[in-house]
Amino acid sequence: MSNQKSTNKHPQYKYASTREKYCFGIGAIGKDAICNLVGSFLMLYFTDTLYLAPAFVGVLFLVARIWDAINDPVMGMICDNTHTKFGKFRIWLVIGTLLNSVVFVLLFHSFHLSGTSLYIYVSVMYILYGMTYTIMDVPYWSWLPNLTNDPHEREKVSVIPRFFASLAGFSVATFGLYIINHLNKIAGEKNLYAETGYTLFAIIIAVIFIVAIGITVFNVKEESTIGVYAEKTSLKQAFRIIIKNDQLLAFIGILLTFNLCTQIAKSFAVYYFKCVCGNEYLYSIFGFAIIAEMAGLVCYPKISTKISREKVYAYACALPLA
């Protein structure tokens, strides 16, 4: 009984070991390094390195986001209906990681194409990037709630991968341009925006991505789902559930708005510093803001034990406006 009190663990719940928690969290480093390089610098690469028309890039990004809105729930259904001896998440995490790593590198390498061929190539690669990222990302975050069924423990566990994700975002956003420039210098390129630096940086991140996910896959247990009965939910049924749940719709609306604002800020910030401030390297200072996000993640588990989630959310929304 004394041991149960000291650990605050309940026998009816399952818990992941400390090793599993951190090995799972490490997996977020590579995936979010990829996500942040694309989110922060892909548009700059398209317009200032490949010299694609900004209007075309904007339309491409919009079409890709619309397709993602369809693609994401489909992948969720696929994961939910997967039954293998490796579980339902691990197999897709491996497949998605390998596919996305290859497409990610190809996204930052044009093979010296030009004209219509380049526009077609970029369009195909970017759509494929979004699809392969979804194949990896959906099972990764879906795996998280299965590490423990204790609601309070889930709050603590969820902080770990998000902290590592923020660390990856901080590293790429703050040092990305410097690394690309340095890689171009090593390759003998004189232009900061030369494609070589982007390609080499993408290869480095892809390797980190594969290693990080490998640490997750080989160190985090997932129970076999062979023979496990679970009621199947079709995509049509899922959409009906969403439409009938007004609270869920409100939450989805908040997430969409938040992600829209975040993506706009990340994509256009480097242009602001380059065109308005006259120095794109000031974007690195902007990247230091992620430290505040990391501090918030560290504080959240303790804060959530003192005040309700509703108040935590309200305060978090108010802080950026203060």
Language-model features: where?
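Membrane-embedded alpha-helical bundles of multi-pass transporters/translocases
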Residues: 2-322
